[in-house]
Amino acid sequence: MGKKNKSKINPIEELKSDCLPILELQYSDPLFQIASHPEQAIIISGLATGYVYCHRYNVTVLENYLQQQKKKFVSDADGKKSKKVKFWTVYDIINENKDNADTGSDSGVELIWKTKRHKGSVRCIALDSDGQFVYTVGTDNVLKKADVLTGKVVKKTNLKNDNGGKYTKMVKSPTHSLLILGDENGTVIVLNSETLQETNRLTKVHNGDDAINDIFHFAKRSIYRYISLGQTTLAYWDARESNESDFKLDPEDTTSKRKVMLSDDQEDEVLCGTFVDPEVGDNLVCGMGDGILTVWKPERNDLEDQLNRIKIAKEESIDCIVPTLQDDNCIWCGCSNGNIYKADIKKGKVVEVRNHSSLDEVSFLDLDYDYRVISGGMDKVKIWQSRNEVSEEEDDEESESFSDSDSDSDSDSDSDSDSDRDRDRDSDSDGDSDGDDIGNGSDVNDSGASGSENDSSDVWEGLENGSDDEPVQEKDETSGSDMDDIDEGSDSSEGELIGLSREELIAELDEDIMEESEQEGEKLQKKRKNEPSKKNTKNLKKVKPSYNDSHGIRKFEGL
């Protein structure tokens, strides 16, 4: 057997993205949750201390600073290798009043408000579809609804949780006044987002007391349908209906319809999930505990089991996932190794990799109002460049390089233009006698120049003689086309026909026609011999028409 090629290529290096962050928010206290405003450049973060911060960022200022730092680094480096440099803005959240007081709003980051919102850590953050209100839940099981721009609490409630579990996930309906929360014991509660009153409850959704890892909307089925992920299963249910009747059914009863539809056991923890296109809802992707993405298709098997797997990172976990929302069949997923992967679900492979941190895992992913990726860990949040911004940056660099090359070549072009003017003056003085020559190409092509001059002179002499001997008006169109065809036939015929009288020319043409008609008759006889039988003609396709080589000559009665 031949030896296998063991050349190893690091796929991460090949797929490493050229996109950079435009902003990095650093936290000295552990970060537990983040949420991005759907319509403005606002990001809200919740910490383990119970504090909630609301910041506004200026994309134009941050992008300009990034470009300036990159240019400055290139000019200062002078081709020398150096350590990794952060070109983007780094903003310390906790020490902002000390370290960033002199920069103010010019830094591109502005603190809108901060407050001690909960006793204990902030567990969940959710925003309205228009970004007017923000909902937060802490380990104190207190739900608060506040205005995003002011931070003022407009309504709050104490969520009764008899089993003592803490809330792990909260989702706000994009179209209706529904607020859905899941806890560590597999319980889902549905609240009215206006009154914060409970309207429905589902218990033990995932095989007992398994925690709710993720909840997202199943809009393709119904505006009230939602999907939850817990432990090793996927479930979907109606937010208006309780599942108490499911516990009265026999566990082995597979015919009765249940309120909660549960998938097969995946034998691995299902941590996060999303639809590739939430509006279409044809492909569902889940992040697994073993570093694999599983692809589900509701129309194929009603979410009973996965249909495809995409390998992301071996011996790692996929902790968070969001769609790109760019109509490219791709999703972003955050991994425990600190990388962000862009996976093409249609191709079934990773197409781009970005590094969030070499020391921390990626716990949160979100998209800002302009579909930029936001990644978060325990100590920092990064807002990344979009692909359009990177392409515009490359175009600007190319235009600058072109302008530099043009400015460098101005002196050369001026000297060349002066020399060209001198040459033009010399050629004008020498070329006055040759100005009447048409199509003189001796300067362009030296080889064959004499032949081209002789041919052109013969053509011009022939045209002059023809115009003197016979007027152009007396020539017939058919005879003109016939002469063209005869000229294309053979060189010997051209030598014989030149200088013949009208009668001799007609006689020569008649002889050619007789010979061609005899040849056509012989071809027809051969064709009849080779004609297929009637039985075989049924199986034949259309036959191309035979080529007619009669030079287009039909009649000479009028000559």
From Swiss-Prot:
Family: Belongs to the WD repeat WDR55 family.
Entry GO CC: nucleolus
Keyword presence, Repeat: yes
Any GO BP: positive regulation of transcription by RNA polymerase I
Stored InterPro entries: WD40/YVTN_repeat-like_dom_sf (IPR015943), WD40_repeat_dom_sf (IPR036322), WD40_rpt (IPR001680)
Gene3D superfamilies: YVTN repeat-like/Quinoprotein amine dehydrogenase
Highest taxon in the source lineage: Eukaryota
Pfam families per the UniProt record, alphabetical: WD40 (PF00400)
Acidic residues biased stretches: 391-417, 482-494
Record's compositionally biased regions (Basic residues): 535-544
Compositionally biased intervals (Basic and acidic residues): 418-428, 520-534
Native source organism of the sequence: Vanderwaltozyma polyspora (strain ATCC 22028 / DSM 70294 / BCRC 21397 / CBS 2163 / NBRC 10782 / NRRL Y-8283 / UCD 57-17)
The entry's keywords: Nucleus, Repeat, WD repeat
Coiled coil region boundaries: none
Localization per record: Nucleus, Nucleolus
WD repeats: 26-67, 77-116, 117-156, 162-201, 207-247, 265-306, 313-347, 354-394, 428-470
Name of the molecule in the record: WD repeat-containing protein JIP5
Major localization listed first in the record, in broad terms: nucleus
Annotated region described as Disordered, given as residue ranges: 386-500, 515-559
